Structures are given as C-alpha cells and as structure tokens.
Amino acid sequence: MSVIRLEPDFRKEMQNKMLQPTDKFNYCLSCTTCATSCPFVDAHSNMNPRIFMRKLILGMKEDILKDPFVWNCTNCTRCTMTCPQHIQVGALVRTVRGNFGLTAPGYVQKIVDDHLRTGNQMEVKQEDYLDTLQWVEEELQEEVKDKNAKIPLDKKGAKYLYVLNPREVKYYTQDILIAAKIFWAAGEDWTMSSKNWDGTNWALFNGRDNEAREIAKRMAEETKRLGIKTVVMSECGHAYLSNYWGSPLWLGEKPYEVKSILHLIEQYLEEGRIKVDPSKNNQPVTLHDPCNLIRKSKCPGIAEVPRHILKQVVTDFREMWPNRENNYCCGGGGGAVMMGSEYKKEVRMKKGKLKADQIRETGAKIVVTPCHNCLDQLNDINKEYQLGVKITQHIHLVDNALVLS
C-alpha cells in the first residue's frame, strides 16, 4: 500500500502566494457543485475541480504539483459562479502554476520570455512594426479617399492609446486597418505607440506574478510617457483581463482606464458617429462569449456590448445557449492553445465538442468572438467537427457594414 504524504502547512503556503490572498478555500464543503458546473469534467481524465480541491485541503502538495489538472484546467472560472463558498478555483490553479517551480508546457513560457526580452510576445522588430503601420496607413488613405487620414504615432495627450495583439501586426494587418478606418470615420482622438504597443500579457497564464508585473509596468510607463489616461484593447480577451483586472493588482495602483475597442464601437453607433448598413451582413450570426472578457473581467455591462453591436450590424443574430457569463469555455483558454504537444490538440478538441454542439444548434453561418485565443480554438473546432461556418471578429462585420461618407 502506497503512503500519501500530507503537508498541512501547504494551505497556508498557498494562501500567502496568491495574488489576492484569501483563506476562503479552507471552507470548501466538498459538495461537488464545482464539478457539476465544469463543462469539461467528463470530457477527458484529470479534469475534476473537486478532486483538486480535496487534494489542496488535505495538504497533498507533492501530488498537486504533479497533477495534470493544473494545466488541463482552462481557468474559465465557471465553477466559481456556482460554488456556495465562491472559492476561486482558477486563482488557486494559477497560484500552483506560477509559485512552485513548475514550467508551463509547450510555448507558454517562451511567449512570456520573448515579451520580456523584445517588448512583444512575437518578437516583432520595431522597424518591421513601424513599416507595417506605414503601409497600413497608405491603405487607409486609399480606402477612405483621404490623403490626410493617419495612424497617429506617439501623439501625446491623445484621448486613447490603441494597443494590439502582436498577431495583428504579423498575420492580421487587416485588423489594424479596420480599426484605423473606424477611428477615422468616428473622428476619434487616438494614437498608437512606437515602443510599447503589445497589450497582451501571457504571464496571466503561467502564473508568475513577477513576470506579469514587469510586463504591466511597461504599459503603465508608456501611458505616462504619452500622457494618456485610457488604453483601448483590440479584440483580445486575455489582453483586456490582464490590463483591466491584473495591472491594478500587479502594480498596486490603477495605472490607466481600460476599454475594449468594442466599447468605442458601441459608443460610436449610439452617438451616430459611424453609420452602418446591416443588410450587408445578412447571414445568421452567433456569438461566443470569451471567458476572460465576459465572465472573468466582471466589467459592468460588458456582456451586452458585443450584442448591442451585432444587433445593429447584422440582420440575423442568434444566441447560443447558455450565453453571457454562463457560456461554456471554448476549451482553448488558460493558455491551452499554445501548450503544444504536451497539451495535445486531441484534448482541446474533446473539450471543443460542447462548443461545436452549441454552434450547430444555432444554425448560424458566422461565429463571432472578441478574442484571439478563442478564434484559434474555434477555427480548430470548425475543422474538427466539420461545422462549415466562418469564424471572425466584430470589427470585420462592422467594417463590412460601414457606410463611409
């Protein structure tokens, strides 16, 4: 018979290492509500939050540090919504990931290291970034037929600093063009940075708060350099969460206000600053709510923002069920999409079956999601389950419906 080593002090150690220290997890009732709320508990093995919690409460430190659940959990926090004690299982998982000598599987740690070393997670050189903005600006001028249309750079005192997911520089430059076109149409006072323009922070996923703090500090310093009070995120769920929720905790102060580009688009539509023709988007559209943006950020009213936009730019919007804060995780969260061979695509696709069923039941032809990680996972799900849908983001539908005067 094997002997299991119990370390009662492990609970206190966990509490002290948490980003937001709490002893609430000591009051776990072992009621299994977390497991019944987890959409993936039966998707594959080592996916039960209740078992993880029991190991933690019993002080099974050695076992927990080897538990695949630590990396299998997508940190969607759906379990916390129904927990009678409101225990933050996701926060506990993140604490284990980053504070006990573990290294994130696949490319997750490399992404963080690259960000710390080069200033952005995809190692884009400054000259390449600036060249990209220059030719995107030329494309903008051609599209809007205005030689004075600009992508402002390092404009001090601008109302908004627009930051990106580096994928938009490397692979999705059209997204930068569309955002600039929307800002031009709305007559917005905005700028981009020549130095710190990456709004992402993958240390949210590896759990290492010292690394997250350094990345957050750089963005805070950039807003001070430019004299800007509000940072606007492109459609990236974890970038929004890491800035809106994470930065005040990592830095000990709220360094700047945070908005999603969706907030601005909603405002422009309400104020009549941009005009759209929804008949340009006449196929049925459904929305996947990203966990980081909709459930975890707890930003008041955030779940309604993408819906307000879609109902004005498409003719046939169909809800998934469940939706908003109760929506199912796509299965690619918590860094899973970049965990490589150590977190096999097969596992992500087992999780993705639930999302595939949700999409299929809507009968939609287009799936919209304001998150790059979700975008990747949904594209894989689309192929795996032969859904035959188009996966896109809000700005593309807004752009398609945009009426330029």
Regions found by a protein language model. Give the residues of each.
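Short, structured patches in soluble enzyme cores that scaffold and shape functional sites
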Residues: 164, 260-262, 289-291
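Ferredoxin-type iron-sulfur electron-transfer modules in oxidoreductases and energy-metabolism complexes
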Residues: 3-21, 43-72, 76, 86-121, ...
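Short cysteine clusters
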Residues: 28-34, 38, 73-79, 83, ...
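A broadly conserved sequence feature marking short terminus-proximal activation segments
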Residues: 1-6, 28-52, 296-300
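A short, charged/proline- and glycine-enriched loop
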Residues: 155-160, 279-285
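An alpha-beta-alpha
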Residues: 280-292, 298
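Iron-sulfur-cluster electron-transfer modules
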Residues: 25, 55-239, 246-250
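Cofactor-cradling patches in redox/metallo enzymes
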Residues: 167-256, 294-309, 318-405
